[in-house]
Design a protein with these regions (language model features):
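A structural motif corresponding to the C-terminal lobe/cap of the Radical SAM core domain
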Residues: 1-104
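Radical SAM enzyme core and accessory elements
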Residues: 79-190
């Protein structure tokens, strides 16, 4: 499970954690949001500037490094990821996409471990300005989420065929005809 809203974790840092877990090729990856329960220690920690929903389940709405707009986007990200990847309705196409994205995953893990020598250097302070944009799983699903939002799909309840059409058009917009064909296969066998 990944939790959005942990201390010092901005959107980029969350993306690194997502990529590290995605590279393990899980059949599902659950994304949750930090809840600030009444009486909890973290709720009283002022340095994180937590703002949470006043009603249960008291989910975090913003932190000192994660503004509301990023948390809102990650809510949509979680919906899109759950709807398409975690549903396992499209195993073949996301297996193919996952294998491509994992190959392009950064050469180092979140700890900075060199994957060739297994040497772990001393931990350095995380600097989000030094994170390179790559063709990784987090970026890919962010693009998918943005396309979902741009199409206004988050405002309506789409039928399965409309969700499949969205995916098909998204894959084609990425120039990935193989993914589009695998989607057709998944649709036929499910």
């Amino acid at each position: 499970d990944l939790i959005v809203g942990l201390p010092y974790e901005n959107k980029q840092r969350f993306g690194l954690s997502f990529n590290d877990l995605f590279s393990l090729q899980p059949h599902a990856l659950q994304i949750g949001f930090l809840k600030l329960l009444k009486g909890s220690g973290v709720r009283r920690m002022k340095e994180y500037q937590y703002i949470s929903d006043l009603l249960a389940p008291y989910e975090v709405l913003s932190t000192h490094v994660l503004p509301y707009r990023d948390i809102r986007f990650l809510k949509h990200f979680e919906d899109v990821f759950e709807r398409f990847y975690n549903s396992e309705r499209f195993r073949t196409v996301f297996g193919y996409i996952g294998s491509k994205l994992i190959k392009e995953h950064t050469d180092t893990s979140i700890t900075g471990e060199d994957t060739e020598t297994n040497h772990v250097p001393p931990m350095k302070k995380y600097d989000p300005s030094k994170v390179e944009t790559k063709n990784d799983a987090f970026s890919y699903f962010c693009d998918m989420t943005q396309a979902w939002l741009d199409a206004g799909n988050h405002k309506i309840n789409l039928k399965d065929i409309d969700q499949i059409e969205f995916l098909y058009n998204f894959f084609l917009s990425k120039g990935d005809t193989v993914a589009a064909e695998l989607l057709q296969y998944d649709t036929l066998v499910s």
